[in-house]
């Protein structure tokens, strides 16, 4: 929520009081959304930054590649969220110089994410034969690798 407070200009307390926080996993989040009254239809992507922070810890996610166990767990969580109804995976890829920063003023996790890790995450969509990759920014050559690895469309 602190990252959202900084970038979306919605106060932390407002989010805390105005939204249910009765979930931990993406499937639980989707169940919570289902229970919550809404005025509009909605669909979700699985954001890679929170998954990486959940599995690796914030400092590790911002400072190194995933190890094999972490990569496998993130891929498992992506598959789990897709099975629960997620549209695909999403990431901000604006680089270290992005002005859209994390709550502590440093780049977002996915701005620093290793390209090869991202490609491995995209392969989950190929395995499932469905889903989209949503990327804010990013290098065209990397985005092309993602589409090739996933066999899926990209929203860029």
Q: Where is each model-derived feature located?
A:
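Divalent-metal coordination cores built from histidine and acidic residues
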Residues: 1-89
